[in-house]
From Swiss-Prot:
SMART domains: SCP. It comes from the Eukaryota. It is found in: Membrane. It comes from Mus musculus. This is Glioma pathogenesis-related protein 1.
Length: 255
């Protein structure tokens, strides 16, 4: 799950006509953006080698996209420190992949494919990694079935983040090797080598709480400071009341 920092020199003559600009970067509600994020992930998950017998289909989650968007806006090129703090109503921990590169070369497909390309460093039989593999293993983590992505223009380039639920990258294999779909959960069907379930794959639209523009960890920090200060003031008021009653026993305190 390490951060990819892409330092790329790109000649103006090679910029694609489909490149994004600061004003055309897609929002997390953009249907084409959502479709591409989901489609590319599932295409890559369906072609893993060796084949997977328990690879779940990934579907979009608006809350994960909100969390990713809030963190991209911080322009802090490191993982969200709240990923294991149950910031999602359905998952105790989240996975996260980060891509940083020139806006002129950014595309959803190229960013996600760059994560998947880490497969060349990963030995499935031994789970050994020769370089960086965490982005690849999260993309193909069989039990991660929800994702939400966001992209933000930052001073150093385009910051593209995908968050996953439940989190992957535990000290075990990313998926079970075997005949495709031979170990899908009960009631699942097989489609393009992926385990699908309409109920599980339904896109929830009931989330109504939006994260503010400032980073999640700052919001939690300020909330904690407020609660601590409130507790300290309450304790001080109790101590002062006891001291006054002890010092002036005949004093009548008005409520």
């Amino acid at each position: 799950m390490q951060v990819i920092l892409a330092v790329i020199v790109w000649m103006a003559s090679s910029v694609s006509s489909s490149s994004f600009t600061a004003s055309t970067l897609p929002d997390i509600t953009n249907e084409d953006f959502i479709k591409e994020c989901v489609q590319v992930h599932n295409q890559l998950r369906s072609k893993v080698s060796p084949p997977a017998r328990n690879m779940l289909y990934m579907s979009w989650d608006p809350k994960l996209a909100q969390i990713a968007k809030a963190w991209t806006k911080s322009c802090e090129f490191k993982h969200n420190p709240q990923l294991h703090s149950r910031i999602h109503p359905n998952f105790t921990a989240l996975g996260e992949n980060i891509w940083l590169g020139s806006l002129s070369i950014f595309s959803v497909s190229s960013a996600i494919s760059a994560w998947y390309e880490e497969i060349k460093h990963y030995d499935f039989s031994t789970r050994k990694c020769r370089h960086v593999c965490g982005h690849y293993t999260q993309v193909v983590w069989a039990d991660s079935y929800k994702l939400g992505c966001a992209v933000q223009l930052c001073p150093n380039g385009a910051n593209f983040i995908c968050d996953y639920g439940p989190a992957g990258n535990y000290p075990t294999w990313p998926y079970k090797q075997g005949a495709t779909c031979s170990d899908c959960p009960k009631d699942d069907k097989c489609l393009n080598s992926l385990c699908i379930n309409p109920r599980r794959d339904q896109v929830s639209r009931y989330y109504s709480v939006d994260y503010p523009d400032w980073p999640i960890y700052l919001r939690n920090r300020y909330t904690s400071l407020f609660l601590i200060a409130k507790s300290v003031l309450l304790l001080l008021s109790v101590i002062i009341t006891i001291w006054v009653k002890h010092k002036y026993p005949n004093l009548v305190l008005l409520d």
